[in-house]
From Swiss-Prot:
Species annotation: Pseudotsuga menziesii (Douglas-fir)
Domain of life according to the entry: Eukaryota
Protein name in the entry: Unknown protein 15
Length: 10
């Protein structure tokens, strides 16, 4: 996947 909206807040 590209983004992980769990802990990865880019």
């Amino acid at each position: 996947v590209g983004q992980d909206a769990t802990i990865s807040f880019k």
